[in-house]
UniProtKB/Swiss-Prot annotation:
This is Uncharacterized MCM-type protein MJECL13. Residues 271-472 form the MCM domain. It holds the Pfam family MCM. It comes from Methanocaldococcus jannaschii (strain ATCC 43067 / DSM 2661 / JAL-1 / JCM 10045 / NBRC 100440) (Methanococcus jannaschii). GO terms for biological process: DNA replication.
Length: 602
């Protein structure tokens, strides 16, 4: 970290012309044309690369330096906007400092009243409060009115009139913004050996609340006295910017060699099938389409503006559904729970009222739903009707309420992979009855699943011999080493042999989640034609259309493509038709009829 004093007037003289050009050519073209009081984030890393080194250093030298630079940039931006005929205000946030300025949490006490940047994981978060950010003042002498915008949590409430110099009186609060308190823990294992540095308190003002996850925080270390006469201070980080880190940036380490190998194997046309066999070995599930669908769900657990892919597996008792779900739960960002043994508060746990510097308010701590970044695997889904019903809002609204009054909610943006046995004698499917009537789940929940797959345990000599052989090999192998052909395979890519095992699969999934393929006009036409044809002869709804779109994007993402093509759509259609023919086929009418999902009153 920089710990130097800079003459701000010299910094202004050195950079004024250069900064005006940057604002005019780079900043203003990217502003929203309608928003007033827009928050504009300026990357200090970018400014440093453009030659504003001393300007960046001066923001780090002291809290005064930070606010002087920020206010100066706001002033220059306002001037340039007025020259172009726009009369609006923007709130500048200086963030994204270069990596060399990043510190560990144990170093925070050494940077009081300075800007810091650090990574951490949220272990506790308050429900959002509101903080007044714009006050209205009136001068008792001359009667003039002034609006004052407070951009930080600590300020001097003495406001003076610009005309008569008299002290102005507070009249009203004009505007509010969300306020949250976060307790953040160091990502490194060594953090457990330290006290106050281990769990710093972060005060954050922003539109979007945070409850769980790995975050990168840029903020100012402030000292708050425990009482008016106390010489003991609490250290608070006043957050300037909070950036949520994706799974790929926090839970797994991808080397350059890993990325090269991932891109190489992605060129194979059968890469999805290969990875699906590693994710769920055919010994656990012999349905190749089901294995492929579950793999695709891991790669695209949540798609912005489209939604998530939810899957229900209904397995006979001979299928080890728990082993399948636990295996998938080991992928970074995923979680596994058995809903039959779960308590309601474990889904999302609120604290009792907790006292702190600000007073008493509820905080969220614990809960498997908010901290799941990918797919939540739920076993025995039809064994706890109360919790299953409570989860319906997580399926539909992407939130989960944590109290009876539904006042407090936590995010639930993960996808769901649920599994259960059929509610029949001996947990075996009755061939004389429809699948939908044997699941034992109400239509309220069933309609939230994009795909429902029955998995039967049918005796097969070759498969049973393979299962027995694998079990014997595991017993013989005392060192618990991986078995080639079962636990890993070697694939040929341009004459090079690359090992694909579960560790490689996890890295592939994490990397592919960063890909955002686009949908072309040809793809839209193909999906529309399929939907029109299905509506002519069968009964499906827009939900199935949306599922095909999500699956098509997920297939393209699994192949690391920039655009979705017709082959991806074909694979998506094959997957959804596999589900529709097995679960919602009406033999009396001879058609696919999804209305069967809504008739189930179990």
């Amino acid at each position: 970290m920089i710990n130097m004093c800079y003459n701000f007037e010299n910094v202004k003289k050195a950079y004024e012309d250069q900064l005006k050009n940057y604002i005019k050519n780079s900043l203003i073209p990217n502003l929203s044309s309608h928003a007033n009081n827009e928050v504009v984030k300026i990357s200090m890393k970018k400014l440093a690369n453009l030659g504003f080194g001393y300007l960046v250093d001066s923001t780090l030298s002291s809290i005064t330096g930070y606010y002087k630079v920020r206010d100066w940039i706001e002033e220059l931006l306002k001037e340039e906007l007025q020259k172009s005929g726009e009369n609006k205000c923007c709130n500048i946030v200086l963030c994204d400092y270069p990596e060399e300025f990043e510190i560990s949490m144990r170093e925070i006490p050494y940077y009081v009243n300075k800007v810091v940047k650090f990574n951490g994981v949220i272990i506790s978060a308050s429900y959002p409060c509101v903080l007044s950010k714009k006050h209205l003042y009136i001068c008792p002498k001359c009667g003039r009115i002034k609006e004052v915008y407070f951009s930080e949590l600590f300020w001097d409430d003495k406001v003076f009139c610009e005309f008569c110099g008299g002290k102005m009186e507070f009249a009203n609060v004009m505007d509010y913004e969300n306020f949250q308190e976060l307790v953040v823990q160091d990502l490194s294992d060594e953090s457990e050996y330290y006290g106050i540095e281990k769990n710093p308190i972060v005060w954050y003002c922003g539109a979007k609340p945070y409850y769980f996850g790995h975050v990168k925080i840029t903020g100012i270390v402030r000292e708050v006295p425990r009482s008016s006469k106390s010489r003991i201070y609490e250290l608070i980080v006043q957050a300037i910017n909070v950036e949520k880190l994706g799974v790929e940036k926090s839970l797994i380490n991808l080397t350059e060699e890993d990325v090269k190998n991932i891109k190489k194997v992605a060129k194979r046309g059968d890469i999805i099938d290969i990875l699906a066999d590693i994710l769920i070995p055919p010994l656990l599930c012999d349905d190749a389409i089901v294995r492929k669908a579950i793999l695709i769900q891991q790669i695209a657990p949540y798609l912005e503006d489209i939604g998530k892919i939810n899957i229900l597996l209904v397995t006979e008792v001979g299928i080890d559904k728990t082993a399948i779900l636990k295996r998938i739960g080991n992928i970074p960002g995923n979680n596994f729970i058995n809903i039959a043994a779960l308590k309601e508060e474990e889904l999302a746990t609120p604290y009792d009222k907790r006292s702190n510097i600000l007073g008493k308010f509820y905080t969220v701590c614990g809960g498997v739903i908010p901290r799941t970044l990918g797919v939540l695997c739920i076993d025995d889904f039809n064994e706890n009707n109360k919790l299953s019903t409570k989860l319906s809002e997580a399926f539909e609204r992407n939130v989960l309420t944590t109290n009876k009054g539904s006042f407090y909610c936590v995010p639930a943006e993960c996808s769901f992979l649920c599994a259960c046995y059929p509610k029949t004698k001996f947990r075996k499917f009755d061939q004389k009855k429809s699948i939908i009537k044997q699941i034992g789940i109400s239509s309220i929940l069933l309609k939230n699943f994009d795909l429902i797959f029955p998995i039967r345990d049918i005796p097969d000599k070759d498969r049973d011999e393979e299962v027995a052989k694998y079990i014997f090999l595991k017993y013989i192998n005392s060192d618990n080493e991986e078995i080639e052909g079962y636990d890993y395979v070697f694939v040929d890519v341009g004459g090079e042999k690359i090992k694909i095992d579960f560790e490689f699969l996890k890295k592939y999934v994490v990397y592919s989640r960063q890909i955002t393929p686009k949908i072309t006009d040809e793809v839209i036409e193909k999906i529309s034609n399929w939907y029109d044809e299905m509506r002519k002869n069968h009964y499906i709804t827009a939900k199935q259309l949306n599922t095909v779109i999500k699956l098509s994007i997920a297939v393209a993402r699994a192949k690391l493509k920039e655009c979705v093509d017709e082959d991806d759509v074909k694979e998506a259609i094959d997957i959804i038709m596999h589900y529709l023919k097995q679960v919602v086929y009406n033999p009396k009418k001879g058609i696919i009829d999804v209305i069967l999902l809504y008739k189930n009153k179990t």
